[in-house]
Amino acid sequence: MNKVYSVEDFPLDEKTMMLHETLFHNANGYIGVRGTLEEGVPQEYNTMRGTYVNGFYDVIPMKQAESLCNLVEEKETMVNVADVQTMHLSFDGETFSLFSGEITNLIRTLDMEAGTTTRSMQWSSPHGHEVQIQFCRMASFTHKSVFTIACKVTSLNFDGELTVSSKHSGIVANYANPSDPRLAAEGRAYLRPQANILENGVSYLVTHTTKSNLELCTAVAHRFSKPGSSLVTYNADAHCYETSYTCRLHPGETLLIEKYTVIQDSIRSDNCLQDAQKEIESVYGKLDALYQQQREYLSEFWKCANMEIDEDDESNLAIAFNMYQLLQSCGSDGKCGIAAKGLSGEGYEGHYFWDTDIYILPFFVLTNPALARGLLNFRYSTLDAARENAKLVGHQRGALFPWRTIHGKECSGYFPSGTAQYHITGDIAYAAVKYYLATGDTEYLIKEGAEILIETARLWCDVGNWYDGKFMINDVTGPDEYTCIVNNNYYTNACAKYNLNWAVKAANILRKMDAFHALADKLALRDEELDEFQRAADAMYLPYNEKLGINPQDDSFRIRRASCRERV
């Protein structure tokens, strides 16, 4: 099945360029780099030039109309960590740009078997210099901290001096668009310079977040295929290194520029600089080996994930594209999840929602259980924060997972369509059960899964109430965010019923493995509480209209008779 998506001779308008920045981004679940042009765009163009690390964040104020008890007053936001893309090419003083001279054979390609994006074109400069240029990018799946750019310049008729100017900037601003609620964060830099080092031609920039107290190190190294003069300079004001390289290029000759970037952060590393040094040394000059490893990794992925619809190439390519985006977005180390926009940009500020657990995780459960386990490990790592979140909104027991988060705290500033969506707690419990049923991973159930099920079941018992022999859940918001704060949302109640039933089942499974007492001691869990879970599950009210034979969305749902008038 074809797994190459490409566009040719596309318009160079702002809307198309922004779309392509997303479609042709590179990511591996840890780092993500938007598909902006290495050489940049005209100043009047809107662009989102960004590099992101999954789970790396800063903390900023959350503005509220009024200050009320336990309203969210600050939030976590994903940080644009560096600019390692910028690369300018100059031919006898004429700087390459898609917006000057004449461009032909312009193609952008995403190869989902090679794990690379390419952009190639033939450029005729205003003075008639003709060159073939290709950029190839890769975020390595086998070396998660590594991002590479390979630029190949072939002279068609140019005979002169080629100058390359490549930047490594550690202070960059986040993007903001006040008219778009998905991008309403502040457009400012969240990193501060901490150190800069130039060692054996490799530039290292160490930065620090302003409030979350996280550290990041980026390392950049270049390799040129032709002899030439090279100089690396540092601009302290911009916390930026610039590598300048010059060589002679004759017709028929090709220059290959390899740019290696390594990113390390203090969430995963105890010494970011040292680990960046080790990794850049291990991969430098080994681009072909990295390409081969990337192909081998994706070959294994497609063996498990591949599916085809007979005689429908367009749908097959669309399915492959979406599967590949899931893979690019998926955190695998238990320290991060899957952001609403993946690592393609700053939409929703890099927050994790219920999408991960109810829509995406089941795909990995069936195709790559190890990745699914990593996502569940991350949710477990935030369980204590979920317990605290439950207390903040007034519950006596249990765990309430946040509607949107990065590190575990609630980052939704609007309660009715945010925190009130209690179903996310049931979604996470559902994901834990589906993983266990598909894999039979009892170790997960013992170490993490059962604890999540018990704590979330406790929440439902605290949230719900008994009325006329039925267990009901009031004042919550279901997946329909246009109908906020309702009683007995069908989806929420069904999730809670499933959650409560499985809390009891998990406890019984652990009894058979002699693992129950350790969990019971840890959680102060008694058989009477398990009986309470079962009673609530058995009596859970699921709205049903007997006359129409349907399940209303919630107690406030109204079915209106359609009114049709004959038109002449």
Describe the function of each predicted region.
Residues 290-437:
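Substrate-binding groove/exosite segments of carbohydrate-active enzymes
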Residues 1-348:
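Acidic/polar, glycine-enriched structural segments that form the non-catalytic walls/loops
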Residues 125-128, 156-158, 329-333, 366-374, ...:
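Secondary-structure transition/capping motifs at alpha-helix termini
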Residues 344-352, 399-447, 455-542:
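The feature captures the catalytic groove of carbohydrate-active enzymes
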Residues 55-57, 172-180, 345-350, 381-389, ...:
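Short, mixed-charge aromatic SLiMs
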Residues 300-305, 309-321, 326-329, 484-487, ...:
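Long, charged, mostly alpha-helical binding arms that flank functional sites
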Residues 136, 150-152, 165-169, 246, ...:
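Short, well-ordered alpha-helical packing segments
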Residues 558-568:
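Residue-level detector of conserved catalytic or cofactor/ligand-binding positions
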